[in-house]
């Protein structure tokens, strides 16, 4: 089975198809994809025909984010989109995410267990426990929040200790 390259992925995101995509690519579209990929800062702009399967995890996540935002969605859903990445790559993908969301003025729902990311990014933090909203923090209160503060508020609101060491240590 034919593996998709970066160009095919970008076209599939735009056209909603998988096969026979590259024949309809104009020079202007190729240049647009190069510019968009160049904005990621990952050296992908010169690799339009590179198979996606050969990219690093961070490159794939950044490409996926770019594809998801090509058509300016009404709502961008990000579900643990940095969870499988090493800390340095995760930080780079989060910076890219923040830039793309801000520049595109995209309404975004990001699900994460990373407390620092939950505090640092976005304008509202909602914490769930056992399927219920136990914290909803925004504005100045969120800006002043620290991980220890968040853990303390979680304990008070839920009556439980936070049990996910990975999230605490993130």
Residue ranges, per PLM feature:
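Short, small-residue-biased leader/transition segments that mark boundaries at the very start
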Residues: 2-6
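ABC ATPase C-loop
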Residues: 68-69
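Helix N-cap at the start of a conserved alpha-helix in ABC-type nucleotide-binding domains
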Residues: 87-89
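Helical segment within the ABC ATPase nucleotide-binding domain
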Residues: 91-103
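H-loop/switch region of ABC-family ATPase nucleotide-binding domains
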Residues: 112-113
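Conserved beta-strand-loop-alpha-helix hinge in the C-terminal portion
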Residues: 132-158
